[in-house]
Regions:
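Short, small-residue-biased leader/transition segments that mark boundaries at the very start
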Residues: 2-6
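Short, structured beta-strand/loop micro-motifs enriched in basic residues and often containing a Trp
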Residues: 14-27, 44-45, 250
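Short histidine-centered loop motifs in beta-beta connectors
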Residues: 25-35
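Short coil-to-beta-strand transition motifs
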Residues: 50-58
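Buried, small/hydrophobic-residue-enriched core segments of structured protein domains
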Residues: 51, 65-432
Length: 432
């Protein structure tokens, strides 16, 4: 991703999207026409009402959009010309205890940005984590560089780390090529350096290598952007959800970074960056773990990049895979492109190139799943609904994103991330 900043005017309307917080069933606590400050709750977790979700801006609630079965899709707020923020009071993180930290995050509507293993869902304050994991290494294709976001936010990042260290031991994972002092010299945490290809940056992979999750145990996982949100809260007493989001992909004119708020409409900073308006796949996130979106979408609570790649629906390749192509990527060396080495770049599109089929090829997942689990057998156990087998094979340690690369190379074309998510949801209901 380029380093050029995409400077944009502030949008008129913002929206908080509940789907960005996995495992949360939202209960809206505002009505249309009501005025809110930034930091005021727009909705809460129905299962745990003390977990609030804060408005990114001050303004008037203009719409509560619902989908099928009245599912809340988003809460929209028209921003004031002069922004007002609820003041939660500055706090010295050095003297706070764990309960005070949790209460501060709950009051300000930021606690929901913390996820947990098992189940890979937004956590609740009654969980007792044995450790907290943060991965500053983003190594998915077209992912943003967290060091870009860290620039100018070093103090807030450290304050957030110190605050969480009062709750449990904090492990910070960094990449071998990351040299920001705020990462290398982070205080009150254990810094672990990771070297290797994607998915080395996945927080689940790091948990598996450092302190695996057994049945009955819980660890918290936090996106590094949220650590900055937490730190700003303690340093200023106010909710500030600004972040740098990468705008990348072969369909983007000038890849770079946009400084936006959570809830910013994509149309405000992506629309004039697209090379074309047709035959383009716009993704909220990276191509492997992101969600298909369009210009009506918004920056989610955990969004770190917006990517655009060719859809591929306008391609008509004569004789398909039979021709010995040199510009097509293949993990199984089906094309001669492997002769050009690993540094050759490819312009991949969104086509699946094949239909779903039985799992015949063995060992495919293990090559790209650097965890001490049998990925293939775990997937089979989830498909067959064998909960005992799933537990034995380590389902409590995984999240859907851990299978993203495996899904990409899978010759069976299975939606592995969806399979894992469905399995985790079923297990969560069984153990509730």
């Amino acid at each position: 991703v380029g380093s050029e900043m995409c400077i944009r005017d502030r949008a008129e309307e913002y929206a908080l999207v509940p789907d960005a917080f996995v495992g949360v069933t939202p209960k809206v606590v505002v009505k249309e026409g009501v005025h809110v400050n930034s930091g005021d709750a727009l909705f809460v977790n129905k299962a745990c009402p003390e977990v609030k979700f804060a408005s990114p801006v001050s303004g008037t609630v203009t719409a509560i959009e619902r989908g099928e079965r009245r599912k809340v899709l988003c809460v929209k707020v028209k921003a004031d010309a002069e922004q007002q923020a609820t003041d939660f009071g500055k706090k010295n993180v050095d003297v706070l205890d764990g309960e005070a930290v949790k209460n501060a995050l709950l009051e300000a509507g930021l606690f929901g940005y913390i996820n947990q293993l098992p189940y890979a869902v937004s956590t609740t304050p009654d969980t007792k984590p044995k450790a907290i994991f943060i991965s500053a290494l983003r190594d998915m294709p077209l992912a943003s560089d967290f060091e870009k976001e860290l620039e100018g936010n070093e103090d807030a990042f450290q304050a957030g780390l110190t605050a969480l260290s009062k709750v449990a031991k904090v492990y910070l994972g960094v990449g071998i090529d990351q040299h920001s002092r705020a990462l290398e010299e982070a205080k009150n945490v254990e810094v672990n350096v990771f070297d290797g290809p994607c998915p080395a940056g996945n927080v689940g992979v790091q948990v598996n290598h450092i302190d695996p999750v057994n049945k009955g145990e819980v660890v918290w996982t936090v996106d590094p952007s949220a650590i900055i949100f937490f730190g700003r809260l303690f340093l200023t007493g106010k909710v500030d959800l600004r972040k740098k989001v990468a705008v990348a992909g072969s369909e983007i004119k000038t890849p770079g970074y946009a400084e936006v708020l959570v809830g910013t409409p994509l149309s405000a900073f992506v629309a004039d960056q697209l090379k074309a308006t047709e035959h383009v796949r716009l993704i909220n996130g990276n191509p492997l773990t992101g969600v298909q979106t369009d210009m009506a979408g918004f920056v989610g609570g955990h969004t770190s990049e917006i990517t655009a790649i060719p859809e591929g629906d306008d391609k008509d390749e004569m004789l398909g895979w039979i021709l010995p192509r040199t510009s097509q990527f293949s993990t199984s060396r089906s094309y001669f492109s492997w002769l050009f080495g690993k540094k050759k770049e490819y312009d991949l599109d969104a086509r699946v190139k094949g239909g779903e089929r039985h799992m015949i090829m063995s060992g495919e997942y293990d090559k790209v799943l650097p965890m001490d689990i049998f990925g293939e057998y775990l997937i089979k156990a989830i498909i067959t609904g064998d909960i005992d087998k799933q537990e034995q094979l380590g389902i409590y340690e995984v999240s859907p994103e851990d299978f993203a690369v495996a899904e990409f190379v899978d010759s069976s074309k299975l939606e592995l991330q969806k399979i894992v998510r469905d399995g985790l949801n079923t297990l969560r209901k069984e153990n509730a």
